[in-house]
Structure formats: structure tokens, C-alpha cells
Amino acid sequence: MAGIYIHIPFCKTRCIYCGFYSTTYNDIQSRYVDAVLKELELRSDYINEPIETIYLGGGTPSQLHFDLIEKLISNLTSSSDVARHCKEITIECNPDDVNDELAALFRRLGVNRISMGVQTFSDERLRFIRRRHTAEQAHKAVDTLRKAGIKNISIDLIFGFPDETMDEWIGDIDTAISLGVEHISAYSLMYEEGTPLFSMLERGEIKEIDEELSRRMYYALIDRLTASGYFQYEISNFAREGFRSRHNSSYWRAVPYIGLGAGAHSYDGHSRQWNIDNIYTYIYKVENGTIPYEREELDAVTRYNDMITTALRTREGIEIKEGGFYDYMMSSAKKLVSEGLLAVDNGHL
């Protein structure tokens, strides 16, 4: 099994572009953590292989009270089996939440990878998307984590803001490189229906950048990061040698995983499950011994297609093996290979 994903939906404020399930009601954090741990008990039969990674995402996991972070991670890692096999524990953070006490707590609990939502080093754009931190706080957060002994830091960047220029984006890339972090993820700004950002676009208050500029920004990202020693191992992800995200890499290889918490998703190799995305209903159901999720059984074609679309995002692509999947995949890919859009190389598509 790839690992455990725990969704922590709490946020102080909502960013205008975010489509993930989140809530600003922080008064029920303790009940929520207890519910997550109880869900893990209720689904113990789901975990039939060693856990290799643990990932706390959100929302904003760094918004949890310190004692609840400790309770959650300590319970997850209390088993000797997990302690022996788990190679990566990641927690997502906002730069403005990072201080000496929190960084020391992470180190003491065995958290060995931090993923920080920096997004941009422009204070103006940070205010536009309603991020709480400043560029200065992002720099300080990296320094604080380093002083605490955290050796694996990833930051997220966004490009393609309305009116953003190529020079401004290159400035963000170069600033990220100067921080010396081990991993950088970068995504084009998405206008998801239901978000305030999408509504602003519909009302004509902002404009998307044109597709050609977005393409040039993406290639500038690749060129500058690879020239600085980062390896692009997935469409949006770049890492120093030895610092790929183990947890996310397992997703792209279609390795089974379990998701805990409101709105979390799971995959067991044959079906997808997703928890209800209402925190109050989630807590109530779990407290009463019910797992509040829906399930979709996947036929072979759906599994194959899912595997193809995720694996083709990666540098290695899909490992080619003889068998039913091979026949299906190669028959589907034949035309694209002949047109030069896909390639077969060293046992991979």
C-alpha cells in the first residue's frame, strides 16, 4: 500500500482559487482528529500491506493546534510496523504558521518532509488570491525549518495570474531556486467553477492570460529549474536528486492508498471510495461507528485508462509488460506512436 492520506480541512481564510473541501470553523478540531483516528480503526482491514508514506494535506494542516498535530501523528506512527516501514511523513504548511516551536515539533515527531504553499513571491498577488502570508514570511519559514533540522522542503508555485508578465514569473522561479529547497511544484492558475476566482472571471473583472504566454511560462519553468539541478519527474513536479515525493509518486503508479477525513479519497486497486465532504456529518457518522463514504467499482478498462492518464504524467511513463493490459494499451497507443506523439523507450511508453 502506498500510504495514508489525512485530509485536514481547517483554514483561517479561503483562497479565492481553491476548489478543495475546507472549512473556517476551527472550533471542532479536537472532535475531528478523534474522528479521523476512529475512522482508521474502523477501516483497519483496508490496510493489508506496510505503510510507506503518511501525508497530511488540506485545507491547512498547520492550522491544527500543536497538541492535536502531536496526537494525530503519534497515533499514526505508534505501530512498530509503521515505524519500521514508513519512509516519508509529509505535512502541508502555510508560511505564516511556521515558527520555531512548530518546526521543532515536526522534527520531534519524525515529520521529514514539509510542503509549503508559497504560490508567489509577489505580495500584491498574494493579497489578490487572499493568501495570508508575505514573501518575507515565506523566506523566513524556510530558514526556520532549516534551523530545526528539516532537510526536505517542497514549495508550491502558481503561474498565469491575470496580467502577470514573463519577467515577473521568471523572478518567482529564480527566487524559489535561491531558497535552495529540495522540491518545487508549479501549476498554472486554474479557474474552477464555484470558486470566487471563477466568479470574477465570469463577471469580466479579470482576464485569463493567453495560451501562448502560459505555454512560454511553463517552458521557462522547465528550462530554469533543470539548469539549476532540478529533475522534472512529473508534469508539474521538480526535485533534487533523491527528493521526489514518494507519496505522490505512488498515486501516479496506481498503488493503493487509504484516505482519512472529510472529503478524502481512497483506492484499493479495484475501486475508488470518497468520504462525505461535510465535516459535521463526517464526525457524527464516525462517532456512531459508521464510515461515511461512497464506493465505485472499477472495470478493467477504467482501471487501465486511469493508469495510463496518471503514469503518462511522469518522466518514466508506463512500464510495458506483456499481458492483457499490454495489448489494450498498445492497441490504443498505436496511432499516437506512429504520429510521434508517444514513444516506446527502454521498456516504457
Regions found by a protein language model. Give the residues of each.
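Pocket-edge structural micro-motifs
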Residues: I8, A262, N346
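A short, conserved structural fragment
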Residues: V337-G347
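Conserved active-site loop/cleft motifs that coordinate metal ions or position small ligands
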Residues: Y5, K321, L341-A343
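C-terminal scaffold of the Radical SAM
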Residues: M1, S22-R43, E49-Y326
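Short, Lys/Arg-rich nucleic-acid/phosphate-binding segment
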Residues: F238, N346-L349
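Short amphipathic alpha-helical interaction segments
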Residues: G324-S338
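Local cysteine-cluster metal-coordination motifs and their immediate loop/turn environment
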Residues: P9-F20
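Immediate flanking context of iron-sulfur cluster ligation sites
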Residues: M1-I8
